[in-house]
C-alpha cells in the first residue's frame, strides 16, 4: 500500500467518487489485448509437435553431458536456463548439478569456469564457498584477468552478485570488475552482441534479471554465437512463441475480467493497469504450467489495486473501516455495512474468489482459504496505516517495516502464486509457512517496500501524504531526503544478500518456494528500478511489446 493522503470528510469523498482520477494516466493499451485472435488450431499443433521433437533432441545432448567436460556442461545448463528452457529438464539438470557440486576436480585456475560454476551452483541452491576467488586476487586489490579475457571478467562480475554478508572477496570483485567493464564498454562496437551483454550486466546483473525477459533478449544474442546448438536455438524460439500465445490468451481473459469489474463496480477512480499488472506477475510465474497462477496473481493484484486506491486516495476513514469489517465476513449479507460505492465491488470480489475455487477443483480449492486469510491480514493492516495517517504519526523505520513489509502484499501474492500451481508438492504446510510471515518472506517484503518508496517518495511529497520509509528515516536520523534515499538503496542491496542467505538455509520446502520469491524480487526490481513503472507505465511499453506482441522470427 502506498502512502496516504490526509483524512477527508465523507462529503468530500462522495463529491470525488463519480469522477475519474486525474492522478493516474489512462491505460496505454485500451482494448488491444481484448481483440487478440490466436493462430489456427493446426498452426499451433504443428508448432507444439516440432517443439516436442526438439525437446527430446536437446534432452539427448543433456543426458550425454558429463563433468569430464565440465566447461561445456556448465555452459549448456546456463544456456538452457537463460533461454527459458530449464523447466523441461529439471531432473537432468538436478542430477548434473549434484555431480558438479560433488566433483572438486576441475581447473581452479580458469577464472571463467570458476565463476560460471560458482554462479550456477549458488543460483540453484548450493551453498558453495566464495574463497575459490581468493587465488585470483592481485596485490593491488584487483583480480588477475588478461585484458583480452573479457568473457571471464563478465562471468566474475555476474557471479559476484550471488554474495552473502561478509564476503569481501565478492564485494571487491564487483567494484573492481565494474570499472574494467565500463572501460571495456567504451571500446566495443555498441551493437555487438558482447557489448549488449556487458551493458545489460552493468544495468542489471544476470542473477537479478526477469527470466522471461532474459530469454526474449538472449535468444537473438545466442543466435550469433559460433558455438550455438541449432536444436537448442530453434527450440528456444519455438518455446517462446508458444508461451507468447498462452500469455496473450491469459491477458485477453484478465482484461475482460477487469473491464467487467470496473464497469459493474463504477469505480472509475482506480488505476487502469491490468496489462502492466499481468506483466509484473508474469515475471514471477512464467513457466508453462503456471497459467492459473498467473491469472490468479493478476486478478489478486487488480483487486489489491482497487482496495489500495480506495484506502489511499478516495475512501474516508469511516468508509475504509466499514470495508475492513465486511471484508472478513466473505458473505453477501455484509454489504449492508458498506457505503453504496463499495457494494458492487464487494460482490464482484466474492465472485472472483469463487471462480478461483471452481478453477482449482475439489482437491485444491482449500488453497483459496489460505489466500482469503492473507487478504484479510492485508486489509487489517491497511486499517492500521490509516490510523497512523489520521494521527499524523511518524513511526521509526523498524516500526514502519513491521507493518509495511506486509501491506506491500507479499503474503497475499506468494499465496496466490502457490494456489495456482498444479505441483502437488505445494501442500497446506507451504501456505501455513507463508502465513507465518517467516524471515525470508519478511525480507522480501522489506525489499519490495523499500524499492517502492525510494522511487515514489519525491512524487508523493507534493501531496498531503503520510510518511514513507524515506520520511521515517529522515526524521529518525536527521538526514536530507537525498541522503535517506541513498541509505535505503544500501538497505535494498543488503536485502538481496539477506534473501540469498535465508534461502540457502531453508529446509523441507519444495524447491519452487524460494525460486518464486526470487522471481518476485526480480520482477519487482524491474518495476521499481529508477521509477514507479506501475503508476507511470510508459517505461514498460517496449518490454510489454517484446513479451506479448512481437513473436521471434523463426
UniProtKB/Swiss-Prot annotation:
GO biological process assignments: defense response; diterpenoid biosynthetic process
EC number: 4.2.3.101, 4.2.3.81, 4.2.3.55, 4.2.3.-
pH dependence: Optimum pH is 7.0.
Pathway noted in the entry: Secondary metabolite biosynthesis; terpenoid biosynthesis
Residues reported in the UniProt entry to bind substrate: 308, 312, 449, 452
Up-regulation conditions: Up-regulated in leaf sheaths after herbivore damage.
Record's GO cellular component terms: cytoplasm
Predominant location category: cytoplasm
Enzyme class (EC, first level): lyase
Motif placement: DDXXD motif: 308-312
Binding site for Mg(2+) 1: 308, 312
Comment text on domains: The Asp-Asp-Xaa-Xaa-Asp/Glu (DDXXD/E) motif is important for the catalytic activity, presumably through binding to Mg(2+).
Other noteworthy facts: The allele found in cv. B73 encodes an active enzyme while the allele found in cv. Delprim contains a frame shift mutation.
Homology family: Belongs to the terpene synthase family.
Description of how the protein assembles with itself and partners: Monomer.
PANTHER family: INACTIVE SESQUITHUJENE SYNTHASE, OS04G0344100 PROTEIN-RELATED
Protein name stated in the entry: 7-epi-sesquithujene synthase
Species in which this protein is naturally found: Zea mays
